Amino acid sequence: MEYRKIGDYTLSRFGLGTKRMPITDASRVDRLDREIAAEIANEAVNQGMNYFDTSYSNHKGEAESFLGDYHEAHSSDTCLIATSFFELVDPRYMYVFQKQLKKLRTDKIDFYSLEGVCDLNKMRDIDSGAVDFLFEQREAGHIGCLGFSSELSPDNLRDFIGRYPWDFVRMKVNYYDWFNKDGSARYDVANKFNLPIIAHAALRTGAASALKPEALSILKDANPDRSSVDWALRFVKSLDGIVSVTCNMHSVREVKENASVFNDTATLSPEELNVLEACAKAQREA
């Protein structure tokens, strides 16, 4: 497993997301299957992963509680915790933060981010006082690294980064948006500020494994043995500005298969990037 630095932290380039952990009751997302969830987390550690991403609302808060228990049972180097605040879920940022510390069983959250920063509400967390409060918590030692999850246009992203001394930015990075939208422009903005990027949605929330036949055939013709998920993860891995990419996984098998992409040294060649560009175009036009 390759590792990168953000501040004083050394984190794996592949991280475990907790948005779709296994549950015991299909009608209750808060009924986390903790036994299988622990097996997934253990396999992630076995694969060299140490970055565990959650949020206040994942599984109605049960994901944070699970990671708190898991973190307490393991060393801090084994399990770095990342969580976030989303004002539309609960605007009481002071209350939410204190509750998160309690659920995560810690007095310091390694990575903390503001969720849902987009063009329509880019001033919301600033005007509410949430941003200043969180920087105070970082100064007090209750947050290790502070960032935000961006849905901003490149111009607004440039402005938002320049307002505060952020430690990182989370953004969607995948080959479909890269070649069809402004994914590369947002990536370039963060890089110009030397702001580390933690990527998510590398699989486009599942679309990478549900390609239309015209797009899938392009990948299969180029490499019959490589899955569409492998292509998608390897694309993000090949971007040097990406410090880590998180993926929501719900089985041990999925962890093993996906982590294998980050446990070898291969990145995509220029020719393979051309293949993905053709695939993205075919997916859009099909």
Please report, for each region that a protein language model flagged, where it lies by residue:
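A short, structured active-site edge motif that brings together acidic residues
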Residues: D77-V89, F111-V117
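Beta/alpha (TIM)-barrel catalytic core signal, keyed to glycine-rich beta->alpha loops juxtaposed to Asp/Glu
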Residues: V117-A286
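Short, acidic/polar
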Residues: V29-A44, D90-R105, E151-F160, S228-F235
